[in-house]
């Protein structure tokens, strides 16, 4: 596993960057073939392309700013690394905020309904998130905790206590615990996963999310979108689906920021789920 497909001199075609390029073109393709969006007046292909570029660019900026804020202790000392998005370091919650800002501006500039645009965006967005996790895997980031810990310990949040106890054991005793969980991924030592947990098999949390995001895309694109819900319902379904996915995956992630003992994604994802449920109730009470 390596972060680039090939290297010529100082140039590297990084998997992470390639996945976002693929996500952009896939988003344009899906938006142009979104029958529900066409019924709602989104028919100009040039406008769709402009919308995709603007929202992706704004989403990347939002994702990077959010990530840098969360990791400010590091980036305050390494300011020159802030623009280096091709090396990884994007936070999806910040990307969603950045995308929403772009959609608000675009809807005002082109006289389009805000929720028509967000409903058109959620399918390509969740598929793009799945592709992005392939790049995370290549970079060895968004990794999970070691898989030799019992599942109940990971989910209960007591991993750090168990990890300290494990490290206090002699190497011969540590070896007895490794077969307890049958699988995992050992990442190269030059990745964030390899530096934090060298030589240990880790839960591939980014691959868990890849699979779940792709399932969510299939549900949105082939099930929910065909139901032709009221404007905004599809967007609320996305908030609920991704909120649930992120809470599940965060149970296995090692890198998530803690706020007063709670993982930050738990808090943000819970807010997403609540907003989605409340949004569905409010939208269903209104008239088109």
Features from the language model and the residues they span:
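A feature for loop-to-transmembrane-helix boundaries and adjacent hydrophobic helices
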Residues: 1-288
